[in-house]
Amino acid sequence: MSDVFNANQFLKTVTSSPGVYRMYDAKAVVIYVGKAKDLKKRLSSYFRKNLTNVKTQALVSHIANIDVTVTHSETDALILENDYIKQYMPKYNVLLRDDKSYPYILLSNHKHPRLAYHRGPKRDKGLYFGPYPNGGAVRESLHLLQKIFPIRQCDDLYYKSRSRPCLQYQIGRCSAPCVGKVSLEDYQEQVRLATLFLKGKDHQVMSVLVGKMEQAASDMRYEQAALYRDQITALRRVSEQQEVSNASGDMDVIGAYYASGVACFHLLFIREGKIFGSRSYYPKVPVNTEVSEVLRSFMLQFYLNSDSQRLTPKEILISEPFEEQDELAKAIQAAQNKKVEIKTQVRGERASFLRLALTNATNAVNTRLSHKNTIEQRFLLLEEAIESTNKIQRMECFDISHTMGESTVASCVVFNREGPSKADYRRYNITGITPGDDYAAMKQAITRRFDKISSSGKIPDILFIDGGIGQLRIAQKVVDEKFVALDNAPTLIGVAKGEGRKPGLETLIYGENEESFTLPADSGALHLIQHIRDESHRFAITGHRNKRQKTRNTSTLESIAGVGPKRRKALLQYLGGLQEVKGASVSELVKVPGISLEMAQTIHDALRG
């Protein structure tokens, strides 16, 4: 505990009401946020002489000040605690790092509604289905829906601009309402059935389709009956792929496992008795934290995060009981205005779901620990191979990617002792150089990386350069200039490709003395170098391809006087791509919304050269 903080004096002023407390260190940084039913009793427990919890001892040793906020109830305190944790991200709290909004399927409010992927604020009018565990689950669902229900998925601008059916109609995945290929009544019926399907009422949809097929066959409308038959077949295949539970209703099932500093919460999302999706979460956990606190903190942030727009089911099953379960349920109920039960003692199908979630969480932690141990071992082998006297904490690797000098991009990827640190990855768009000059590109990238070195604080111990002696010399020169007055310059190592570019034959070169050396092909140290080199190459080439595609799609059109981003987008969407725009006649161009006859002629002349 800081010498400036007088715990006894402070505790005399604390009330016994419920509330939230914030603990600060000597730099006035919030290091812990907690809540209590009785603030005085809870805060007094931190300053007992017989503290045995190592984490609490470490926390108390850094306390310089404490702020207290009194609330009306313990439920209010829970909600405020979550808000403060999100705001301050305290060092000693369990932190749920995933804070992205969840994706939904949107059925728009339109004469001919469309099905679309949606993430973010619900500004568009319509029905929202979800949330889904991830974007891939939404896209897979949309793909399946297209096979069963021929409902449009194009945006409204594309819909308005159509004069003939698109490819989706030709392959049977859209009924082309844009050009009147389906009656309004039939289209709305497909929308109704899709809505039922998205609500999990497969059996009801099946009954309707079977009835329609039988009626069409009875009326000798055999072609229509065949369409219904195909819909039924597709629906049955999809339904068979989903695991069905005898446990009715909606529930979240949480399997919690914590070992060797790694925690995983595996969630099964059960909707209408089916496994709607699953997802694993790996919160940041302070050392020596109890499992019960980890689970409580995770659920607090997961279910009270207003930014996620999450719809919580009435039933939550958890594999580990913890104190304040009832209080947390009340807080969720207050936040979402619905009754919620948190259960641990369950039987039958629910118990089976809990076992499944716990198995997945356990396997995920063991896999992470195995990977973590492998990475750690490779770091040790690398330290031994290069005879490093210091522990390597951070490594970076640079690579350059371009096509004949076009759209040059440099990548910087970062590894720490747990593996890739993707939050620290950076790309640099290279400009103002002679196309294809890799040396100039490397110089610009390294210069930009270390331009603000005095305030960065994140200096790599080793800087790998994917290239030969020439690029390494350029990088070493920049580093020498940037670190001339500093003593923490990184060690530079060039990674030159071996004969035939075969892995295992790489030549490694020290930047300082240009001494070269090799490592055995089966060396764990070399595998680590190959890993960061390959990741740098992947990250660079992905950025380059994206930039090149964007340039090719935009520069040709936007270089034409009068064609800005909006007109470019309208042209590409209406006609289907850049090649189609180039091949369009003036009469076809003028049909695009926002393109006058004069503008159409200008575009036509510019593209035909």
Swiss-Prot record:
It is found in: Cytoplasm. Residues 203-238 form the UVR domain. SUPFAM superfamilies: C-terminal UvrC-binding domain of UvrB, GIY-YIG endonuclease, RuvA domain 2-like. CDD domains: GIY-YIG_UvrC_Cho. Gene3D superfamilies: 5' to 3' exonuclease, C-terminal subdomain (1.10.150.20), GIY-YIG endonuclease (3.40.1440.10), UVR domain (4.10.860.10), UvrC, RNAse H endonuclease domain (3.30.420.340). InterPro entries: GIY-YIG_endonuc (IPR000305), GIY-YIG_endonuc_sf (IPR035901), GIY-YIG_UvrC_Cho (IPR047296), Hlx-hairpin-Hlx_DNA-bd_motif (IPR003583), RuvA_2-like (IPR010994), UVR_dom (IPR001943), UVR_dom_sf (IPR036876), UvrABC_protein_C (IPR050066). One of its GO terms (molecular function) is DNA binding. GO terms for cellular component: cytoplasm; excinuclease repair complex. GO terms for biological process: nucleotide-excision repair; SOS response. It comes from the Bacteria. Residues 16-94 form the GIY-YIG domain. Keywords: Cytoplasm, DNA damage, DNA excision, DNA repair, Excision nuclease, SOS response. Interacts with UvrB in an incision complex. Belongs to the UvrC family. The UvrABC repair system catalyzes the recognition and processing of DNA lesions. UvrC both incises the 5' and 3' sides of the lesion. The N-terminal half is responsible for the 3' incision and the C-terminal half is responsible for the 5' incision. This is UvrABC system protein C. It comes from Shewanella halifaxensis (strain HAW-EB4). The gene is uvrC.
